Amino acid sequence: TAKCADEGHVAVFGDRLKTVPVRKRASVFDTLKTVNDIGKDIGMGTEHGIWLFWKAAIEQKQHWDTVFVYSDQQAGHGGLFGSGGYSVAGRGCSWPGRRAAYIDVPMLINLYRKKVNPKVHVVMVQTAGYQDTLVPEQYDRTYILGGWSDQIIKYAATMIALRDGPQQ
């Protein structure tokens, strides 16, 4: 996906998050080796990366036009644990009324849209075949897809063009 953009990145997550720039002229295999090497030492956390990504994007005002999330979509939908007292830009981002902290990913996306880029497109790609997702299907500029195929990129580009018009 990242090689299809003018500027792309791959985020490797576990207990921490590390973002790797993807260069169009670089070998896919070299990028894969870099990503795999990072993965060996990033920690075993499986949900933490999505929260860290949006936290950094909001607090550092990183401008993203489109964010693809390839995931089993098991983080932040009100059923999985996050770190207590989680806050982004001075705002708590946990589901209300819970004793434990469950990170609210839709709240993070909305906060990003409010503070950084209201027109960001978020493409959630369900990779595990579960029947859930990180965000509600009706969110504007948010697309829920599934599977592994180069057609995902084409489909997302078509959906974005239908929403915003052709890219210049």
Q: Which residues does each predicted region cover?
A:
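Acidic, glycine-rich A-domain
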Residues: T1-Q168
